[in-house]
Swiss-Prot record:
It catalyses: (1S,2R)-1-C-(indol-3-yl)glycerol 3-phosphate + L-serine = D-glyceraldehyde 3-phosphate + L-tryptophan + H2O. It comes from Ruegeria pomeroyi (strain ATCC 700808 / DSM 15171 / DSS-3) (Silicibacter pomeroyi). PROSITE patterns: TRP_SYNTHASE_BETA. This is Tryptophan synthase beta chain. One of its GO terms (molecular function) is tryptophan synthase activity.
């Protein structure tokens, strides 16, 4: 918990970009000047009223913020315990939380004179958000996406291309988010003069984890204000799904010093957290190491080689986690649990049936933990879960798992 060294859980990172022993910047000599230049530009922007005025205008008039805080009445009644609220970031322009951060980074890129934006993407939501903002500002956009994810997230691939982005399928490794990030970093090293790397999560070398967190914390700031208006007090528990952890950090950060609020992050348990490593639960089943420029919890073998991991959710299919989450885990301010594919699918179906909301598979993991937790809590206990993305992109994946033949115009089950 907070001690004399940390008067606030919100004080990190330090000047070297570290949260305790986590974070930092482990990058090549070629990239270090870029990283330092980005940090300098962001530090200037943070205290520049014109920067935040532009952000606020775009958040309001382009993204559609604030997103609603919605009382899920029928879901609450079905679960029979705590009151469940959803922070509806799936209603943002582009359908997820990702655009909150992309706007900030691309405004920074323009201030730095960069004309080419590169990004990595897993579920495709960060890629779509990046392509969207690049189209708005007339910037060249290149998105690296694992070949496996290109296949399972076809709707988002088409959206990116419609928006003018070049989508590059990455075939190395297992063709997922980790591999896409590797190739994006290689591109950045090669094209340092005109290129800005727009990272989609709270990972990577400093200042990315803190910068992305700051842009995403609009989620938690709004939720806190909206909850005070709705209930006259803070929530008892806040819950969010975690891949790299940007939507979760965005919800959690404004509540870190409110120690009465329980904070729970939900990792992707895949087929179960066991020695087979068919999951992406880095905190539940991993250990500290270095990947993509920062020290954090990772899935790795006994020799320190990074493992591929697995999840039904492309956006959670990452073998690491943001360093601030690793620190919050170690100091005990947040609790981290895992949810399996099948539990997430059950939550997906329940949300559709009770609330008329089709969630993405990523927040379905958070919702699955709500389904476990809420019935055990009193009716005056208040939960906020972050509905960080909509499920349009996942209908083909879900249909396959549920045995529904999408190619059949009659809409029959596959076994019929």
């Amino acid at each position: 918990m907070a001690n004399d060294l940390f008067n606030s859980f919100m004080s990190g990172p330090d000047e070297q970009g570290r949260f305790g022993i986590f974070g930092g910047r482990f990058v090549s000599e070629t990239l270090m000047p870029l990283i330092l230049s980005l940090e300098e530009e962001y530090e200037k922007a943070k205290t520049d009223p014109s920067f935040w005025a532009e952000m606020d205008d775009l958040w309001t008039n382009y993204v559609g913020r604030p997103s609603p805080l919605y009382f899920a009445e029928r879901l609450t009644e079905h679960l029979g315990g705590a009151k469940v609220y959803m922070k509806r970031d799936e209603l943002n322009h582009t359908g997820a939380h990702k655009i909150n951060n992309v706007l900030g980074q691309i405004i920074l890129a323009r201030r730095m004179g960069k004309t080419r934006i590169i990004a990595e993407t897993g579920a495709g939501q960060h890629g779509v958000a990046t392509a969207t903002v690049c189209a708005k500002f007339g910037l060249k956009c290149v998105v690296y996406m694992g070949a496996h994810d290109v296949r399972r997230q076809a709707p988002n691939v088409f959206r990116m291309r419609l928006l003018g982005a070049e989508v590059i399928p990455v075939t190395s490794g297992r063709g997922t988010l980790k591999d896409a990030m590797n190739d994006a970093l290689r591109d950045w090293v090669t094209n340092v003069r005109d290129t800005f790397y727009c990272i989609g999560t709270v990972a990577g070398p400093h200042p990315y984890p803190a910068m992305v967190r700051d842009f995403q914390s609009i989620i938690g700031k709004e939720a806190k204000e909206q909850m005070m208006k709705a209930e006259g007090r803070l929530p008892d528990t806040i819950i969010a799904a975690i891949g790299g952890g940007s939507n979760a950090m965005g919800l959690f950060y404004p509540f870190l010093d409110d120690t009465s609020v329980n904070i729970i992050g939900v990792e992707a348990g895949g087929k179960g957290v066991n020695e087979k490593m068919e999951h992406c639960a880095s905190l539940t089943g991993g250990r500290p190491g270095v990947l993509h420029g920062n020290r954090t919890y990772l899935l790795q073998d006994d020799d320190g080689q990074i493992l591929e991991g697995y999840s039904i959710s492309a956006g959670l299919d990452y073998p690491g986690i943001g360093p601030e989450h690793s620190w919050l885990h170690e100091v005990g301010r947040a609790k981290y649990v895992s949810i399996t594919d099948m539990e997430a699918l059950e939550a997906f179906k329940l949300c559709c049936a009770t609330e008329g909301i089709i969630p993405a598979l990523e927040p379905s993991h958070a919702l699955a933990h709500v389904m476990k937790l809420a019935p055990e809590l009193p009716k005056d206990h208040i939960i906020i879960m972050n509905m960080c993305g909509r499920g349009d992109k996942d209908i083909f994946t879900v249909a396959k798992f549920l045995g529904f033949d999408m190619s059949d115009t009659e809409g029959r089950d596959a076994e019929d």
